[in-house]
């Protein structure tokens, strides 16, 4: 910071004293209607926000760089700074400037950080905003990772004896901030993306004894067993670190957190961060959100709570059949009734973010606009309920189950209706209390409706009709006192007064008190005039004070309803989640899959939902796929661009959707529940950690081989391509063998490869089955049929794909020559060996005698450019040629032969 002159004003002394306690935060210092920043903070903020940088006291010894933002618009500016990774300390005036003796007292009331914000301006409505804490006990070889969304009060965590697993979850949950004990480094394997790591003192944040007390106090429990934390000291420490950090930044103990619920991994399908990225669940491979992701396809939610529940279910699909089938029942019920579903969508569209609204109200951070949003949301609850209830008969009665025959509510919905709470008492209170368009700030007044509070009504009447009340009093005195010439006046010295001429002053009644004598007039006051004047002068201030007190009382009353509000918010979130799945299924022609506890996966005419949406359903080619005990590992071959990766990804996505309880993009599907989905798809590297593409590939492969079980689903694409041909093929081969040996019968695997030699494993290793993406050669071109068919591909067609990609003709031609040369060399080398080695890969067995003869009599490689006629002959498909086409082609060749002969001569 700039070294200031010793001569400081009281204001700067106060500023620097406060700033000293928050050296790592930008200090927003409240001065009237602005927040001002000084010195280095001002220069940083002006640069990041692109606002004017000025100077306070430019002619004094202490020249302080300064910038400022209006109080009423501060949220937007803070949001920009938080997105850039800055911390912001809010320093408020904690006493009324009118009552201050000297400098107004100020103090930091909260510290805003990326992981602790609760205002809508700083949050994505449909995404959780997590603060995380990771702790590892080296002595016990155990650790924990916990996370909390302060804006909703939800928090959870997990305990593990595997440090790598904890870091995987930290990457998957992607907290905005991750708390670590001081001295702990991020491992090389962890890629945290936009997550900021915050080192905090272990003794103050991760201490077990004080942390246990902190957790029990925050949760209002006498022991840890009710929270699922008994016997998990590392998880207690991680939770305690979260609470300590929140108390430090929020300047208050947060009692709004929901009961802690440890994540039960046994109930959920586990999808790690790598697989989420490879399947493009939330972000495209280029890191962007929006079109091109599964989230973009599935998100037809209308409420922020429903959107966050969808995100949660995509992160943690079910592993148990019961919740999957319950979800399917509701989705199917809504899927079949378009009218009811649209009515439900219309009603839900009126609901705001009840979870975050109730949090801000509970923490006294809500604005009047938040209460209006809550009122509108509560008012929509009866309409939402009505969409679920059976339609009434003209007589006003409801039909019985027998009469509706098939219209019976699924159990989750009937249970929901039996516990439904319209919160009518609070909706009515908010309707009676608040105006339709209250000001943004409580202190501006104009919050409450007439009739809500008698004292406020009187003050409002005075403020609005004060002049009329004065004229009424004047008219009354003129009549009662018999003084028709009595006048009413006002000046700043004496205030309001009655005035009479000197001649008429002798006849004033006794209750008139003389205030001033002028040359031609006398001025008087009365008790009633003084009382009315006092009311008028103080009416505005008293009104604002009373409105603020009423608002705080209203806030306290509404805050008591938070458990009821959160209960209904959870119901609405589930309704929104279910209708979103039903709406997506109806729009895209998806079907309800059969989800079972076996291991078979059967998909008929499966589609990739994202690719289909991008290309259009008319051009997308669906595919069948079957995995059972005889087909545990499918080896998929075919050229690049043929669609191997699409088949791999769509299979994993269909399984994920099925275990969410959603419908799937297929004509028919039967899915054996998986415990984990693993993927190794596409090229990636981690240059920051010095890890090459091949190293990352091998690390991910190693993790799959260590963690996959018989119930897992593994998709592997091009294992071994990042190294030499024989190294890569050997590794791919060994991985296939290992996958078929593991878990007592092999792991369900889709394995795409260009190493055609590996396809010889079918028939040699039980469970291995060859499939390929069909193509067709036509008039020298290749046509991608995108169809998955049995058997291995006959060749890779890599050079043809290069030609289609626009590689120069000379390069393609030369590649063909080199390929032919390499193939002849390989065949000749095979002919020199008399017997195969025992270690020769089955796919590399020696050629037959006839193949050896063919090799011997093959012509030597040409040194020049290959004749165009030879290219045409080799590329022709005689099976699909008519006699007329053959004659036409021969004529063309004859002309071509003559042209080339003339060129040579």
UniProtKB/Swiss-Prot annotation:
Keyword DNA damage: yes
Pfam families per record: MutS_I, MutS_II, MutS_III, MutS_IV, MutS_V
Location of region: Disordered: 389-410, 826-847
Cellular component, GO annotation: cytosol
Stated role: This protein is involved in the repair of mismatches in DNA. It is possible that it carries out the mismatch recognition step. This protein has a weak ATPase activity.
Biased composition (Polar residues): 831-840
GO BP, one annotated term: mismatch repair
Family according to the record: Belongs to the DNA mismatch repair MutS family.
Source species, domain of life: Bacteria
Encoding gene (name): mutS
Any one GO molecular-function label of the UniProt entry: mismatched DNA binding
CDD domains (alphabetical): ABC_MutS1
UniProt xrefs under InterPro entries: DNA_mismatch_repair_MutS, DNA_mismatch_repair_MutS-lik_N, DNA_mismatch_repair_MutS/MSH, DNA_mismatch_repair_MutS_C, DNA_mismatch_repair_MutS_clamp, DNA_mismatch_repair_MutS_core, DNA_mismatch_repair_MutS_N, DNA_mismatch_repair_MutS_sf
Official protein name in the record: DNA mismatch repair protein MutS
Keywords assigned: ATP-binding, DNA damage, DNA repair, DNA-binding, Nucleotide-binding
Matches recorded under NCBIfam families: mutS1, PRK05399.1
Binding site for ATP: 638-645
């Amino acid at each position: 910071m700039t070294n200031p002159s010793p001569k400081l004003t009281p204001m700067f002394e106060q500023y620097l004293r406060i700033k000293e306690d928050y050296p790592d935060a930008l200090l927003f210092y409240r001065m009237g209607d602005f927040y001002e920043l000084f010195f280095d903070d001002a220069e940083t903020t002006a640069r990041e926000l692109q606002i004017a940088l000025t100077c306070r006291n430019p002619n004094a010894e202490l020249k302080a760089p300064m910038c400022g933002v209006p109080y009423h618009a501060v949220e937007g500016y803070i949001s920009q700074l938080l997105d850039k990774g800055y911390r912001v300390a809010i320093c408020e005036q904690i006493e009324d400037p009118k009552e201050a003796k000297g400098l107004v007292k100020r103090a930091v009331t909260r510290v805003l950080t990326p992981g602790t914000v609760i205002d809508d301006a700083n949050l994505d409505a449909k995404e959780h905003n997590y603060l995380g804490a990771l702790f590892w006990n080296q002595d016990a070889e155990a650790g924990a990772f916990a996370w909390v969304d302060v804006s909703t009060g939800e928090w959870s965590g997990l305990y593990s004896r595997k440090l790598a697993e904890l870091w995987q979850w930290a990457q998957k949950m992607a907290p905005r901030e991750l708390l670590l004990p001081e001295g702990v480094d991020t491992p090389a394997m962890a890629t945290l993306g936009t997550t900021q790591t915050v080192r905090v003192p272990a003794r103050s944040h991760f201490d077990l004894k004080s942390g246990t007390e902190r957790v029990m106090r925050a949760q209002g429990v006498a022991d840890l067993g009710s929270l699922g934390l008994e016997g998990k000291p590392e998880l207690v420490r991680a939770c305690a670190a979260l609470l300590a950090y929140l108390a430090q930044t929020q300047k208050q103990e947060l009692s709004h957190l929901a009961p802690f619920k440890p994540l039960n991994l046994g109930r959920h399908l586990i999808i790690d961060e790598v697989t989420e990225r490879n399947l493009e669940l939330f972000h495209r491979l280029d890191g962007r959100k929006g079109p091109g992701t599964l989230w973009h396809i599935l998100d037809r939610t209308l409420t922020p709570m429903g959107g966050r529940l969808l995100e949660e279910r995509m992160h943690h699909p079910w592993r148990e059949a019961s919740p999957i089938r319950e979800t399917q029942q509701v989705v199917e019920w809504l899927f079949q009734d378009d009218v009811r579903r649209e009515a439900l969508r219309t009603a839900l569209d009126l609901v705001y973010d009840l979870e975050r609204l109730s949090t801000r109200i509970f923490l006294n951070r809500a604005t009047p606009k938040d209460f209006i949003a809550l009122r509108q949301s509560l008012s929509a609850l009866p309409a939402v309920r009505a969409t679920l209830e059976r339609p009434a008969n003209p007589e006003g009665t409801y039909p019985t189950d027998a009469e509706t025959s098939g219209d019976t509510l699924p159990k989750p919905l009937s249970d929901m209706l039996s516990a439904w709470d319209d919160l009518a008492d609070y909706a009515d209170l908010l309707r009676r209390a608040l105006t339709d368009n209250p000001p943004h700030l409580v202190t501006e007044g104009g919050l409450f409706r007439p009739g809500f509070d008698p004292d406020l009504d009187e003050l409002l009447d005075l403020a609005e009709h004060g002049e009329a009340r004065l004229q009424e009093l004047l008219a009354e005195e003129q009549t009662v006192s018999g003084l028709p010439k009595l006048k009413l006046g006002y000046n700043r010295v004496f205030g309001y007064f009655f005035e009479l001429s000197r001649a008429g002053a002798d006849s004033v009644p006794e209750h008139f008190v003389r205030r001033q004598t002028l040359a031609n007039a006398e001025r008087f006051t009365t008790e009633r005039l003084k009382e009315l004047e006092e009311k008028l002068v103080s009416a505005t201030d008293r009104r604002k004070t009373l409105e603020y007190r009423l608002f705080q009382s209203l806030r306290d009353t509404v805050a008591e309803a938070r458990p009821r509000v959160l209960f209904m918010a959870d119901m609405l979130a589930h309704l929104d989640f279910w209708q979103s799945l039903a709406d997506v299924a109806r729009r895209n022609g998806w079907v309800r899959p059969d989800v079972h506890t076996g291991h078979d996966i059967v998909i008929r005419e499966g589609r990739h939902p994202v690719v289909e949406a991008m290309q259009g359903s008319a051009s997308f080619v669906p595919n069948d796929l079957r995995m059972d005990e005889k087909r545990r590992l499918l080896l998929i071959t075919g050229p690049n661009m043929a669609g191997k990766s699409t088949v791999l990804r769509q299979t994993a996505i269909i399984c994920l959707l099925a275990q969410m309880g959603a419908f799937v993009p297929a004509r028919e599907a039967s899915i054996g529940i998986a415990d984990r989905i693993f993927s190794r798809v596409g090229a990636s590297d981690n240059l920051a950690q010095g890890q090459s593409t091949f190293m990352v590939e091998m690390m991910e492969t190693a993790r799959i081989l260590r963690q996959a079980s018989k119930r897992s689903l593994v998709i592997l694409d091009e294992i071994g391509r990042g190294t030499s041909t024989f190294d890569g093929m050997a590794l791919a081969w060994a991985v296939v063998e290992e996958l078929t040996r593991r878990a007592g019968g092999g792991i369900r695997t889709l394995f795409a490869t260009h190493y055609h030699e590996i396809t010889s494993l079918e028939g040699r290793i039980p469970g291995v089955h060859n499939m390929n993406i069909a193509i067709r050669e036509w008039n020298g071109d290749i046509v991608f049929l995108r169809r998955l068919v049995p058997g291995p591909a006959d060749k890779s067609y890599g050079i043809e794909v290069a030609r289609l990609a626009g590689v120069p003709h000379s390069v393609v031609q030369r590649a063909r020559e080199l390929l032919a040369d390499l193939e002849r060399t390989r065949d000749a080398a095979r002919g020199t060996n008399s017997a195969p080695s025992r270690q020769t890969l089955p796919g590399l067995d020696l050629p037959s005698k006839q193949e050896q003869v063919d090799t011997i009599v093959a012509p030597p490689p040409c040194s020049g450019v290959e004749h165009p006629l030879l290219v045409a002959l080799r590329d022709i498909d005689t099976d699909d040629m008519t006699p007329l086409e053959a004659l036409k082609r021969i004529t063309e060749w004859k002309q071509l032969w003559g042209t080339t002969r003339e060129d040579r001569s």
